[in-house]
């Protein structure tokens, strides 16, 4: 069976046709050109079926109240399916790709900025540590110089203490002999005197000397003070 009808545009459409070529229906011949036209109409029908589908069902309503209020009726529902054209799909995919690329670029830019800031922070930290290291080295060098100077001063102090002790002993001995005088006679020789500075005199006796003969004496001097 063949069904011929007109669509909303006034075009004649044929459905449920035989796939064989050269089939006649009355005065109409379905050749290759008509078959292409029929196939195009079938594709439009399929698109229309995909866009809008309808269904019906029957159900009973039992509202509260008297039994006469119960009834049954048939409902028709139309289900609409939106089909996006290829151009819209391409535009959507292009926009998605652009958004993805923009998002990737933004993420890369943020990562580079973060890495740059981290590098700058590490460089500043290295410079700070180098400065601290130089300060510690200078302190160590100054400490070594101080220790060397301390050793030198200690040695100088010990030397000064020794000199002071020598001077004090000499001064104490001179103080004990200050103002003393004596005459000592041994083997007919006179050991003479001590002056006010307690410089001991040693008299050398020779044979035949008397008290009236001149006396040769040797007066020792205190050790010189070394500076």
From Swiss-Prot:
Chief localisation class? nucleus
One biological process term from GO is: negative regulation of response to salt stress
Q: Which domain of life is it from?
A: Eukaryota
SUPFAM superfamilies for this protein: Leucine zipper domain
Q: Where in the cell does this protein reside? A: Nucleus; Cytoplasm
Any idea where the bZIP domain is? Answer: 94-160
List, alphabetically, the SMART domains matched: BRLZ
Q: Does the keyword Transcription apply?
A: yes
How is expression of this protein distributed across tissues?
Expressed in young leaves and cauline leaves.
Q: What induces it?
A: Induced by salt stress. Induced by osmotic stress.
Give the start-end ranges of region Basic motif: 98-118
Record-linked PROSITE patterns: BZIP (PS50217)
GO (cellular component) term, any one: nucleus
Subunit (UniProt): Homodimer.
Comment field (misc):
Plants silencing BZIP24 show enhanced tolerance to salt stress. Enhanced salt stress tolerance in silencing plants is characterized by enhanced root and leaves development and reduced sodium accumulation in plants.
Q: What does this protein do?
A: Transcription factor involved in the regulation of salt stress response. Functions as a negative transcriptional regulator of salt stress acclimation response by regulating cation homeostasis. Negatively regulates the expression of genes contributing to ion and osmotic homeostasis during salt stress, such as the Na(+) transporter HKT1, the Na(+)/H(+) antiporter SOS1, the aquaporin PIP2-1 and the glutamine synthetase GLN1-3. In addition, targets genes with functions in plant growth and development, such as argonaute 4 (AGO4) and cyclophilin 19 (CYP19).
Spell out the protein name for this chain.
Answer: Basic leucine zipper 24
GN (gene name): BZIP24
């Amino acid at each position: 069976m063949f069904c011929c009808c007109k669509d909303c545009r006034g075009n004649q459409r044929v459905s449920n046709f035989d796939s064989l070529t050269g089939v006649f229906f009355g005065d109409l011949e379905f050749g290759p050109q008509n078959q292409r036209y029929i196939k195009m109409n079938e594709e439009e029908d399929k698109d229309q079926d995909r866009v809008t589908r309808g269904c019906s069902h029957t159900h009973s309503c039992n509202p509260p109240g008297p039994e006469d209020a119960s009834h049954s009726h048939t409902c028709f529902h139309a289900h609409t399916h939106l089909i996006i054209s290829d151009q819209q799909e391409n535009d959507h995919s292009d926009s998605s790709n652009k958004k993805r690329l923009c998002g990737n670029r933004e993420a890369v830019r943020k990562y580079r900025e973060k890495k740059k800031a981290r590098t700058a922070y590490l460089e500043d930290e290295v410079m700070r540590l180098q400065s601290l290291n130089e300060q510690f080295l200078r302190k160590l060098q100054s400490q070594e110089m101080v220790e060397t100077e301390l050793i030198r001063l200690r040695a100088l102090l010990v030397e000064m203490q020794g000199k002071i002790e020598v001077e004090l002993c000499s001064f104490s001995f001179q103080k004990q002999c200050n103002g003393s005088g004596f005459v000592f006679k041994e083997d007919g020789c006179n050991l003479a005197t001590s002056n006010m500075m307690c410089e001991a005199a040693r008299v050398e006796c020779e044979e035949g000397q008397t008290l009236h003969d001149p006396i040769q004496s040797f007066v020792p001097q205190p050790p010189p003070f070394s500076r």
